[in-house]
A protein has these predicted regions:
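Alpha-helical transmembrane segments and their immediate juxtamembrane cytosolic regions
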Residues: 1-255
């Protein structure tokens, strides 16, 4: 992960990393659209490997956003509203969508992948808040466990939330950040390996390809002021927008 202090402005700006995350996510979701299931083919595997760059970058910037925000409630509210909108976009874009009842959580009978990753990102933000509360450790642990249960049905389950907690609570200590994230992602990969698909379980470990990129983060925004203004909302709004687009393509062209 990245250091808290930035001795040099060389490297990648936050806007560059966010743009990279957007491109990787788009490629990943196009792969799910064109190659449903878990095909062991070079093209979809390559696209999914590149797509593993997205979640760690998102988690990192949620943790950074928590550190820098001047209004936590507004930040959390925006993320909550985005999670609600993204839920409908996520289900509409997924192979599980059939009709309006598909939008009802757990209607399919599964407890996994019932909503988008933004729900887990929100859970991670709330975990950081809980971690900073002035209360007994057992109360913090209980609240974090509750948030794990609430985010478990989301894409990336509670793992994304726990990674945000690890990154934010160990800010300035890249070794601890990486150690805890490695533990959580390995756990996720193991569950994926034994319950869904072995090859794609191993593929989840490709999230660590994002570590060298995050180490290059220089803590700065783009020198292009217009790009910087656009990237701030686009980084979040692009998620539901591109999923709605994928859903439309699936409905009208691939059904």
């Amino acid at each position: 992960m990245s250091d808290a202090a930035f001795p040099s402005r060389r490297g990648l700006t936050g806007d560059a990393l966010k743009l990279l995350a957007i491109l990787a996510m788009t490629l990943d979701h196009i792969a799910w659209l064109l190659f449903p299931g878990y095909p062991a083919q070079a093209m979809p595997l390559t696209m999914h490997i590149i797509g593993r760059l997205t979640c760690p970058i998102m988690c990192y910037f949620i943790a950074e956003g928590y550190h820098y925000t001047r209004n936590f409630r507004r930040y959390a509210l925006r993320l909550f509203l985005l999670a609600i909108v993204s839920h409908f976009a996520y289900i509409y874009a997924s192979n599980a969508y059939q009709d309006w009842r598909s939008f009802i959580p757990f209607y399919s009978g599964s407890v996994l992948n019932q909503t988008g990753v933004v729900w887990s990102l929100l859970g991670g933000l709330l975990m950081l808040r809980v971690n900073d509360l002035d209360c007994a450790v057992w109360k913090k642990a209980a609240l974090i466990l509750l948030l794990c249960l609430l985010t478990f049905p989301a894409d990336w389950s509670c793992i994304a939330a726990l990674c945000i907690l690890s990154i934010g609570s160990n800010r300035g200590n890249p070794k601890k950040q990486l150690l805890w994230c490695t533990f959580y992602v390995s756990l996720y990969g193991a569950v994926y390996y034994f319950s869904l698909d072995r090859l794609y379980g191993v593929l989840q470990l490709c999230v660590f390809l994002s570590v060298p990129l995050l180490r290059l983060y220089n803590g700065a925004r783009s020198k292009n002021a217009a790009l910087s203004r656009v990237m701030k909302p686009l980084f979040y709004l692009y998620y539901p927008l591109h999923l709605f687009a994928i859903g439309l393509i699936r409905t009208f062209f691939l059904s």
